[in-house]
Amino acid sequence: MEVKVYRVKGIFQRGKLKQPFTKEYRALKPEHVEELVYSEIGSKHRVPRTKIWIESIEEIKPEEAENPVVRRLSLEL
């Protein structure tokens, strides 16, 4: 199995405010990325999973990653 880089776009609602987000993760499957998003945003912003809407999960090349940590980890291997 190969670890891939994914970019996730979506929206979460905190109170009356809807906040867009874009995150990048390294994972084996898109399902793992989905779980990471729910876990990280829910924990950091105290938002329940029902208030987090994932619009897209796309696989990207490691060179396209904007997050320097994700890019560096992906390119070193």
Curated annotation (Swiss-Prot):
Q: Which Pfam families match?
A: Ribosomal_L18A
Under the GO molecular function aspect, what terms does this record hold? Answer: large ribosomal subunit rRNA binding; structural constituent of ribosome
Q: Does the keyword Kinase apply?
A: no
Q: Which domain of life is it from?
A: Archaea
Annotated GO CC locations: ribonucleoprotein complex; ribosome
Matches recorded under NCBIfam families: PRK00773.1-1
* Family (UniProt): Belongs to the eukaryotic ribosomal protein eL20 family.
Q: What is this protein called?
A: Large ribosomal subunit protein eL20
Q: What is the originating organism of this protein?
A: Thermococcus gammatolerans (strain DSM 15229 / JCM 11827 / EJ3)
Query: Corresponding gene?
Result: rpl18a
